[in-house]
Amino acid sequence: MSTESMIRDVELAEEALPQKMGGFQNSRRCLCLSLFSFLLVAGATTLFCLLNFGVIGPQRDEKFPNGLPLISSMAQTLTLRSSSQNSSDKPVAHVVANHQVEEQLEWLSQRANALLANGMDLKDNQLVVPADGLYLVYSQVLFKGQGCPDYVLLTHTVSRFAISYQEKVNLLSAVKSPCPKDTPEGAELKPWYEPIYLGGVFQLEKGDQLSAEVNLPKYLDFAESGQVYFGVIAL
């Protein structure tokens, strides 16, 4: 082989080498793009499956048989428990009338459906407030009678004797009359019933004494339990 032929072969080899290198690089680039595309599709598919089956993302509320969301129901239960625990230590009283005495209104706490709790006290027929605060005060009485020989006015009053100014004042009061002023003929023989309910929210002080009274206790109806009562609830 001549020197010129060897030189030409070397030159041809040098010219072919970049072409081969370019082809190799192009093949490698295509392989990388294919691999990246595969990983992207696989990742998107995996993410879709995780979201679809609820493994990640917003959790679905499981349902009770009645259709209520489990998570919402649990939250409501915890809220109710918390509210119950917070209110369980508040003063409360509910007293009922003594039906064994006549022509007077005497309150009792040692009876069914009656209670004194968390500092409330019943003393001298009055409920004693154990702490400053807002209180719901309520009372109900039921009057009954036979006929209307005379014009009758029935009053029911809830009063407060305040420790701060040592004076008894009315908190709640109502007046009713079962008989009209002009009594119709035959009304003397008919029975009548008059309920009076009082209730309101008041700012009270520790030591305040609350009383619930009527002007004509002889007309009170004690025939059924739950008709005459008096209560205080701290808010």
UniProtKB/Swiss-Prot annotation:
* A Gene Ontology cellular-component term: membrane raft
Query: Lipid attachment points, N6-myristoyl lysine kind?
Result: K20
GO biological process: one example = positive regulation of cell population proliferation
Residue numbers bearing the Phosphoserine modification:
S2
Extracellular topology: which positions?
57-235
- List, alphabetically, the SUPFAM superfamilies matched: TNF-like (SSF49842)
InterPro entries assigned: TNF, TNF_alpha, TNF_CS, TNF_dom, Tumour_necrosis_fac-like_dom
Q: Which Pfam families match?
A: TNF
Which residues does the annotation list for site: Cleavage? Answer: S34, L35, L39, L40, C49, L50, L51, N52, T79, L80
Q: Which GO terms describe its molecular function?
A: cytokine activity; death receptor agonist activity; identical protein binding; protease binding; receptor ligand activity; transcription cis-regulatory region binding; tumor necrosis factor receptor binding
Disulfide pairs here are C148-C179
* Membrane-topology descriptor: Single-pass type II membrane protein
Looking at the record, the residues that make up the THD domain are 91-235
What are the alphabetically sorted keywords of the record?
Answer: Cell membrane, Cytokine, Disulfide bond, Glycoprotein, Lipoprotein, Membrane, Myristate, Phosphoprotein, Secreted, Signal-anchor, Transmembrane, Transmembrane helix
Cytoplasmic face of the membrane = 1-35
Write down the glycosylated positions: S83, N86
TM regions (residue ranges): 36-56
* Protein family: Belongs to the tumor necrosis factor family.
Q: What is this protein's name?
A: Tumor necrosis factor
Provenance organism: Mus musculus
The record lists the lineage as: Eukaryota, Metazoa, Chordata, Craniata, Vertebrata
